[in-house]
Amino acid sequence: MIQKKTFIHPTSIVEKGAIVHEGAHIGPFCYIGSQVEIGSGTELKSHIVINGITKIGKNNVIYQFCSIGEVNQDLKYKGEFTRVEIGDSNLIRESVSIHRGTEQGEGVTCVGNHNLLMFNTHVAHDCLIGHHCILANSTTLGGHVEIHDHAVIGGLSAVHQFCKVGSYAMLAGCSAVVKHIPPFILAQGNHASLVGPNTVGLKRHFSEAKYKAILRAYQLLYKQGKSLEDAKLELAKLAELHPVVILLLNFLNQIDLNSDKNRGIVR
């Protein structure tokens, strides 16, 4: 179904069954599969393949040579009906690949709203990217990776399967992540290790009072020699006075130390 006021270049192929909403713009030499939905105001520049069960929201801009919704690279995948969901107002630059999910995950690879995925970023099956994230050039996400809101991933970095990068965290360029990066943290290296709090990002997003509370939480987690469980007890007390700390506490509570997929946190 192609609605009115929609532009589709005559060299592009839109399969029967695809839904292209009003105001969408599909440039030359694109392929849109039969189970794809493209929201209003979304622009596809040129030479883009969108396939599988893929839903793309409103006002996204997708640049040339991107591949979205194709079969993932998990060898266990046998053609199950899994999907990709992309929200609104994302900027997806050249040669980005976003693969469909697997039944072993949640069945969906998800990108939220207002994200920037720079050139040659790879988003593997079952990844979850929140809102307002930046993934710089040639970022590589393994399967089941989570990138939480306002996180920044430096260029040429890779994140191991099942790792989580917390909100407002930053990973420096050319890093390799094999453990979870908690919220508010700056990490760097191969393997990525703790540098300190993400001071530049925190000052940009938070008031002075909240910034100081986050620094206090950082001290409790990293600088007082506490076990993770003891640190969580102290963080819970701090969160009663400063709700911004709940973001860190919830992240740590999501980590199942007894799971065979637990990666631990960067130190």
Swiss-Prot record:
| Listed CDD domains | LbH_UDP-GlcNAc_AT
Question: What catalytic activity is recorded?
Answer: a (3R)-hydroxyacyl-[ACP] + UDP-N-acetyl-alpha-D-glucosamine = a UDP-3-O-[(3R)-3-hydroxyacyl]-N-acetyl-alpha-D-glucosamine + holo-[ACP]
* Major site of localization recorded for this protein: cytoplasm
Q: Please list the GO terms describing molecular function.
A: acyl-[acyl-carrier-protein]-UDP-N-acetylglucosamine O-acyltransferase activity
Q: Which domain of life is it from?
A: Bacteria
> Does the UniProt entry include the keyword Protease?
no
Keywords of this protein's UniProt record, alphabetized? Acyltransferase, Cytoplasm, Lipid A biosynthesis, Lipid biosynthesis, Lipid metabolism, Repeat, Transferase
Return the GO cellular component terms, semicolon-separated: cytoplasm; membrane
InterPro entries per record: Acetyltransf_C, Acetyltransf_C_sf, Lipid_A_LpxA, Trimer_LpxA-like_sf
Pathway assignment reads: Glycolipid biosynthesis; lipid IV(A) biosynthesis; lipid IV(A) from (3R)-3-hydroxytetradecanoyl-[acyl-carrier-protein] and UDP-N-acetyl-alpha-D-glucosamine: step 1/6
EC number(s) for this protein? 2.3.1.129
Q: Where in the cell is it found?
A: Cytoplasm
Q: Which residues cross the membrane?
A: none
Q: Could you provide one GO biological process annotation from this protein's UniProt record?
A: lipid A biosynthetic process
Please explain the role this protein plays, according to its UniProt record: Involved in the biosynthesis of lipid A, a phosphorylated glycolipid that anchors the lipopolysaccharide to the outer membrane of the cell.
Q: How does it assemble?
A: Homotrimer.
Recorded protein name is Acyl-[acyl-carrier-protein]--UDP-N-acetylglucosamine O-acyltransferase
State the organism's lineage: Bacteria, Pseudomonadati, Pseudomonadota, Gammaproteobacteria, Enterobacterales
